[in-house]
């Protein structure tokens, strides 16, 4: 009896864990997604309906509750604006994410496409994310163009997302 319970428990745990493992081990996942933040999405695999949370590799967007300052000194939530921009970009579209990896924080990262366009670069080009030099220098040129055109976050005064996160950690201690 105890043995049967043990086997049943293991089977349930495997069933709960398996979709995440299988999604991460795949080379490519296509499906619809929802924006969780300006650089993170939850992708639903078209094939097996599993879901995986993916941060767009090589970019960094303001966090939710990260405020920016307008030229007139008004504070606005740039994290929400960045999330809404990503949400509008991916709405009702099928994404394909490839090159899955885990960064040093354990977050799953990927390069994602909307058709033949790289979503990661689209977000930086729109000005709602920055090149995340800790991972890649691929988007530095695109970031510079967005910054000079004052697109997205570049029209405001703000802390770089990684600096803002460090400050939040220090304040929480």
Residue ranges and their predicted role:
Residues 2-9, 13-173:
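Small beta-barrel nucleic-acid-binding modules, primarily SNase/OB-fold domains
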């Amino acid at each position: 009896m105890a043995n049967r319970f043990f086997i049943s428990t293991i089977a349930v745990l495997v069933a709960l864990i398996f979709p995440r493992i299988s999604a991460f081990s795949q080379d490519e996942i296509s499906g619809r997604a929802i924006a969780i933040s300006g650089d993170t999405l939850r992708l639903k695999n078209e094939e097996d309906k599993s879901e995986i949370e993916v941060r767009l590799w090589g970019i960094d967007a303001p966090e939710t509750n990260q405020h920016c300052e307008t030229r007139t000194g008004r504070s606005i939530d740039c994290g929400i604006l960045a999330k809404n921009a990503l949400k509008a970009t991916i709405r009702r579209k099928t994404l394909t994410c490839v090159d899955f990896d885990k960064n040093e924080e354990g977050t799953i990262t990927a390069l994602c496409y909307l058709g033949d366009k790289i979503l990661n670069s689209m977000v930086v080009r729109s000005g709602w994310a920055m090149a995340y030099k800790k991972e890649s220098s691929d988007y530095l040129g695109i970031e510079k163009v967005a910054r000079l055109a004052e697109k997205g976050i570049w029209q405001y005064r703000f802390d770089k997302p990684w600096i803002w996160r460090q400050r939040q950690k220090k304040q929480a201690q």
